[in-house]
Amino acid sequence: MKVYAAPFEKFVNLADARLGTKILSVTDDWFADANRLFQPTPAVWKEGVFDDNGKWMDGWESRRKRFEGYDSAVIRLGVAGTIKGVDIDTSFFTGNFPPSASLEACFLASGEPDENTAWTEVLPSVELQGNSHHYHEITNDQAFSHLRFNIYPDGGVARLRVYGVPHRDWSKVSEDEQIDLVAALNGGRSIACSDEHYGSMSNILNPGRGVNMGDGWETARRRTPGNDWVIVALGHKGEVEKVIVDTLHFKGNYPDSCSIQGAFVKGGTDSQIETQSLFWRELLPSQKLTMHAEHEFAEQINAIGPITHIRLNVFPDGGVSRLRVLGKVSR
């Protein structure tokens, strides 16, 4: 079972490049492109690799500052949301990491920040160490769409992870519109699973189809009785009309079959929901799966009314690239 370094790591990484996160402006990224901060894969070290500007580094690295000031990057998050915590990762930056960093944020319904934008400090200046992860909980309950990441005075950071709950204005979604209720961009989040040895449970909610086998959720080979499962909180309560289970790239390691349970959960913690899910109603009866394919189920869906959570069961184990739960929102 995967061990999380911080509890908030189970939330969606709002700064994931796969969600569309990008740099809008940066004071300096001479040595390494600031957009590398958002790559979903861990940073790597490439021994002896240099480019025209110096040693190739997997992250954002600015020049040595020879005047007053500090470096900063303005970031548009792929999806706006409430931030639960951040990880400032300086992996492989040893003699060139910033001594400290801070984070500011703002929310814009449209457009990009300018000189008149009011920024809110969500993480005061914190000390950094080389080749290390720095986990910090954020207690601000506002939703934010943009960040300003400050490093003092210069240097390199490998990755910036911004974990939180995606925000969507559901008042703009028609009751007649069919929408993916579990999509990360719509606020869906994976909250618990039996195992995620080879791939994160959050991957199945990402947009688009998986780029490879690592861009999905895959469990270890099960050597004990039972089956693997993942619990997902819908972005908004709704009634399910169709489910898509995609096993793209999973050929010798796809599940033999799957089923889905659902429930309208009114309270409780994530750990309590894990136990309750055993007794949820059957939304999708057991269905056979095949390798490397999208499986659509509509006629097989049971009408169980509005729900807030689903539990995807895979038998006995294996990998799933994407999960789509299509339906209409309930007010």
Swiss-Prot record:
Entries under Pfam families matching the protein:
Allantoicase
GO biological process, alphabetically ordered: allantoin catabolic process; purine nucleobase metabolic process
Molecular function GO labels: allantoicase activity
Q: What is its EC number?
A: 3.5.3.4
Q: What is the protein name stated in its UniProt record?
A: Probable allantoicase
Q: Does the keyword Ubl conjugation apply?
A: no
- Species source reads Pseudomonas savastanoi pv. phaseolicola (strain 1448A / Race 6)
Q: Which family does it belong to?
A: Belongs to the allantoicase family.
- Position of the signal peptide: none
Query: What pathway is this protein said to act in by its record?
Result: Nitrogen metabolism; (S)-allantoin degradation; (S)-ureidoglycolate from allantoate (aminidohydrolase route): step 1/1
Report the catalytic activity: allantoate + H2O = (S)-ureidoglycolate + urea
For the protein in the UniProt heading, the enzyme class is: hydrolase
Keyword presence, tRNA processing: no
Q: Which UniProt keywords apply?
A: Hydrolase, Purine metabolism
